[in-house]
Amino acid sequence: ASGAAATVAGGINNTANGSYSFAAGNRAKAIHMGSFVWADATNSDFSSVANNTFNVRASGGYTLTSNAAGTSGVRLPAGSGTWNSLSDRAAKENVVPVDSLDILAKVGALPLSTWNYISQDASIRHMGPMAQDFAAAFGLGENDTTISTIDADGVALAAIQGLYQQNQQQAQLIAQQQQVIADLERRVAALERGSKP
């Protein structure tokens, strides 16, 4: 550790050159100020990318648990770019079916907008609802300032089911109307021929 107030916590071939940086594991390179770098046993350098960043290489995947038993949390499988949230039936209780058409109507009324976070540059745009509106519409999650991806995904899937139900109803109505039209066309053709329908 050559950076001011930097630490190499253990492992081998690690460096902490950035001031207030931390390196541990195998070939972890904390080269930026305030950077934290932990590298697994992979035999190649793993370096910080900017000042004040948290950098972890875990080529076997990541697991973050949010309870003492380790039965709740998220995983980032090896080689993946997306977090997997716990959704096991065995981990759930008070399961209640949803009314997909009701959810669809609420999604239709949900204000959506584009925006940027105050902490980010104004050119970095995002799209979606405000957490307060989402909580008021669906009553999901722990508070009205955040939206869980599990809840947003569930609402989207329920709304898609509602659209599917509407589509099926419309398809049935169209089929019935096509039959009525075909019957009327036969009657008109018969009348034009001067015979009884």
Feature map (PLM): residue ranges:
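Glycine-rich, low-complexity segments
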Residues: 56, 60-104, 169, 183-186, ...
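Stable alpha-helical elements in mature extracytoplasmic
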Residues: 91, 103-106, 130, 156
